[in-house]
Amino acid sequence: MQVHDVELTISAVEENQYPATALPELALVGRSNVGKSSLTNVLINRKNYAHTSGQPGKTQTLNFYEVEHKLYFVDVPGYGYAKVSKKQREKFGKMIENYLTTREQLRGVVQLVDGRHAPTEDDRMMFQWLAYYHIPTLVVATKVDKVKPNAHNRIVKVVKEGLGAAKDQDLILFSATTKKGAESVWQWIEERTGVSD
């Protein structure tokens, strides 16, 4: 999809701040610093629109990016970061859970995992939680440019096994540097949301 118009509409901390539109929404979840902002920037064809944070756990709001007046990307607070207090973690947890389970406009979730390593326990828990609620999920293994191309098949196997995913689980290898996988991610998003050029 060709993207020309993007706007960060709201950084929400509670439900009454969510955009009051019927546009389809697509949530991006993943551990802190897994590359959510980088993926967003590649998808919307901007350099630093979605702020790439040097401080893991910094995104503590649900950030709604309106794309082409057709859909929203919703950047969800990163999970699994130790320096965020337990109270803050619980608060995020509740907000994320409410959003993912009750938001009618939500059409699917893109879960990012670091393609250089096996998924963490947090990654697995998030994936299983999404599966439990039957939320359509695309797994994106990031930073694959840091892994030799001949190891890419192994990444797919390790990630699926680590998440406890079915063999036919949608999974895309992605690199923000080379843009590998970006087109396939867009294709999945378009299928889920019914949005296209």
Swiss-Prot record:
Keyword Cell wall biogenesis/degradation set for record: no
Top-level division of the source organism's lineage: Bacteria
One Gene Ontology cellular component: cytosol
Pfam families xref list: MMR_HSR1
Range of residues in the leader sequence: none
PROSITE patterns in alphabetical order: G_ENGB
PANTHER family reported for this sequence: ENGB-TYPE G DOMAIN-CONTAINING PROTEIN, MSS1/TRME-RELATED GTP-BINDING PROTEIN
Functional summary from the UniProt entry: Necessary for normal cell division and for the maintenance of normal septation.
Family to which this protein belongs: Belongs to the TRAFAC class TrmE-Era-EngA-EngB-Septin-like GTPase superfamily. EngB GTPase family.
Name of the protein this chain belongs to: Probable GTP-binding protein EngB
Upper lineage: Bacteria, Bacillati, Bacillota, Bacilli, Lactobacillales
